[in-house]
A protein has these predicted regions:
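Beta-hairpin "wing" of winged helix-turn-helix
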Residues: 52-67
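A generic structured-segment signal
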Residues: 33, 43-44, 74-75
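Amphipathic alpha-helical dimerization/coiled-coil segments
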Residues: 80-104
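Short, charged/polar surface micro-motifs in flexible loops or helix N-caps
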Residues: 21-24, 51-53, 77-80
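N-terminal helix-turn-helix DNA-binding core of bacterial DNA-binding proteins
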Residues: 2-41
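Basic amphipathic alpha-helical segments that dock to polyanions
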Residues: 42, 46-52
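Basic, amphipathic "hinge/linker" alpha-helix immediately C-terminal to the N-terminal HTH DNA-binding motif
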Residues: 64, 68-86
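Surface loops and adjacent helix of pleckstrin homology
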Residues: 47, 60, 84
Length: 104
């Protein structure tokens, strides 16, 4: 595992979704609806965030006959990291937008 999290726009979007209520457990399907990301994009991001220990993941028992569901929430480090990543991402993109306006 690389020592640095790859910060894509999609990863920022997922982190931002968790920041809406950092203590809440979230389902992948719910996150997919919130972010608009397809499962093939979302689940690798969730796995990577869990690998970096920014998310905790567990299985939730469901009604009889239904399979258990994976649920996720931010860890304390994940909350701190999400806030830092989103702040730096926002600043970087604000500068890029300002530079583009100056150039045009």
């Amino acid at each position: 595992m690389s020592s640095r999290l790859r910060l894509t726009p999609q990863t920022v979007h997922v982190l931002d979704a968790f920041l809406e209520d950092p203590q809440e457990w979230r389902y992948g399907y719910d996150l997919s609806r919130t972010t608009g990301l397809k499962s093939g994009t979302l689940y690798p991001i969730l796995m990577r965030l869990a690998e970096y220990r920014l998310l905790e993941a567990t299985w939730e028992a469901t009604e009889a006959g239904k399979p258990p569901r994976h649920i996720y929430r931010l860890t304390a480090d994940g909350l701190r990291s999400a806030r830092e990543h989103i702040r730096s991402y926002s600043i970087r993109h604000a500068w890029q937008a300002a530079l583009e306006r100056v150039r045009s």
